[in-house]
């Protein structure tokens, strides 16, 4: 439960854009959640985003509605929430190592993959894909972990400085990440057929994964109250 911040930020289809995720992570709720990591032996002074929103490429068809995912062999990382999500949405998730994803796409072992625009460009996934569907389904957090014993050895003045610098650095990192995504998307527009999912059709993702949300609530990772507070902060 103490790692609820990371779990909530990658929660499938919970937020519609990375800026809303950032708003939650920088809020009092986000800071309170980070403090809970102390129970697991971590101190987190700040959390950012590891790239932009994750979107879907594939070689079969544009993803305009949830129904278009049905039967697609989707490469996923070995992350439980990702696997559960694509199963819930009707796809056939296949765990493939990140470094082996390009070859898996090229040899048709999988039909598609999900990653931020930057990864799709840097790893040249577009060479083995035909469609990019901008669905903004998930974002991965980038928590800055430090040893609590080390942190607690600092004077109060040094703790304050460390916390302030950590937060400022993470804000700078987020700005660089999110600004760069626009350029990466423009590159992909020249390589792939791009479609942007209509907001009303994206609601199908939200409906389709509510059972996944409930699973993690039942497991004690977070509560519906925390989810609703996060959505209120994000203004969804």
Residue ranges and their predicted role:
Residues 1-5, 9-10:
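Single conserved hydrophobic/aromatic residue that forms the stacking wall/gate
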Residues 6, 51, 69, 139-141:
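Extracytoplasmic
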Residues 11-13, 18-22, 52-56, 140-144, ...:
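Small-molecule pocket liners
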Residues 16-41, 67, 199-202:
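Short, solvent-exposed loop/beta-turn-alpha elements that line the ligand-binding surface or hinge
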Residues 31, 163-167, 171-236:
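An extracytoplasmic/periplasmic, membrane-proximal ligand-sensing/linker region
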Residues 31, 35-111, 119-122, 175-178, ...:
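Bilobed "Venus flytrap"/periplasmic-binding protein-like clamshell domains
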Residues 81-83, 92-176:
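Pocket-lining segment of extracytoplasmic ligand-binding domains
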């Amino acid at each position: 439960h103490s790692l609820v911040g990371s779990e909530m930020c990658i929660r499938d289809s919970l937020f519609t854009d990375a800026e809303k995720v950032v708003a939650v992570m920088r809020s009092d709720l986000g800071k309170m959640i980070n403090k809970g990591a102390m129970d697991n032996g971590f101190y987190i002074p700040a959390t950012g985003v590891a790239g932009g929103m994750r979107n879907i490429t594939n070689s079969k068809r544009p993803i305009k509605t949830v129904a278009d995912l049905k039967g697609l062999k989707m490469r996923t990382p070995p992350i439980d929430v990702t696997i559960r999500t694509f199963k819930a949405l009707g796809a056939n998730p296949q765990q493939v190592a990140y470094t082996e994803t390009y070859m898996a796409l090229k040899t048709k072992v999988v039909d598609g993959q999900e990653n931020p625009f930057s990864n799709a460009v840097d790893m040249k996934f577009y060479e083995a894909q035909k469609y990019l569907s901008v669905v903004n389904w998930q974002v991965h957090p980038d928590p800055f972990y430090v040893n609590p014993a080390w942190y607690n050895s600092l004077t109060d003045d040094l703790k304050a400085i460390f916390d302030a610098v950590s937060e400022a650095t993470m804000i700078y990192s987020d700005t660089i990440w999110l600004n760069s995504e626009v350029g990466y998307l423009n590159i992909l527009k020249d390589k792939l057929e791009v479609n942007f999912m209509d907001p009303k059709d994206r609601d199908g993702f939200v409906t389709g994964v509510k059972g996944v949300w409930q699973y993690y609530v039942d497991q004690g990772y977070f509560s519906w109250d925390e989810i609703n507070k996060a959505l209120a902060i994000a203004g969804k």
